[in-house]
From Swiss-Prot:
Its EC number is 4.2.1.10. It comes from Syntrophotalea carbinolica (strain DSM 2380 / NBRC 103641 / GraBd1). Belongs to the type-II 3-dehydroquinase family. This is 3-dehydroquinate dehydratase. It is an enzyme of class 4 (lyase).
């Protein structure tokens, strides 16, 4: 069975509590439950991983390379805008990457408009709340089909 790794970056464990105007009131636990349901509907295995520690995220990405995951969906949170370490780790992957964000990063503060991950990703989905993850999983599923 194909496997997709969903990565949640810094501060995303605070979904449901942090800035509901941008992120809504759905918790990360609820988001991960939906992700599992959507993955089952799409016919692949999924693992969700969240950390607030950049080195742990890089290590999980390195492990994904060794595991030959079939696709990665990532919401790196604020790391999106400045973490060359996360970007360098992602560059190692052979699997397609889909970047997602709950809020529209291009309609927010200027510093959020730039993504150091975007150039590595097959595409970016943002601004659709929790549905950004659903759309990201659909994109990952389609990319897996195309690449196999």
């Amino acid at each position: 069975m194909k496997k997709v790794l969903v990565l949640h970056g810094i501060n995303l464990n605070m979904f449901g509590k942090r800035d509901p105007a941008h992120y809504g009131t759905t918790t990360l636990k609820e988001i991960d439950a939906r992700i599992s349901e959507w993955a089952a509907e799409l016919g692949f295995e999924v693992e969700c991983f969240q950390t607030n520690h950049e080195g742990e995220m890089a290590s999980r990405i390195h492990a994904a390379h060794e595991e030959n995951v079939d696709a990665v969906v990532i919401n790196a949170g604020a790391w999106t805008h400045y973490s060359y370490g996360i970007a360098d780790a992602l560059a190692i992957l052979k699997a397609p990457i889909v970047e997602v964000h709950m809020s529209n990063i291009h309609a927010r503060e200027e510093f959020r408009h730039h993504s150091v991950i975007a150039g590595l990703a097959k595409g970016q989905i943002c601004g659709f709340g929790v549905d950004s993850y659903h759309l990201g999983l659909i994109a990952a599923s389609n990319l897996i089909k195309v690449e196999n």
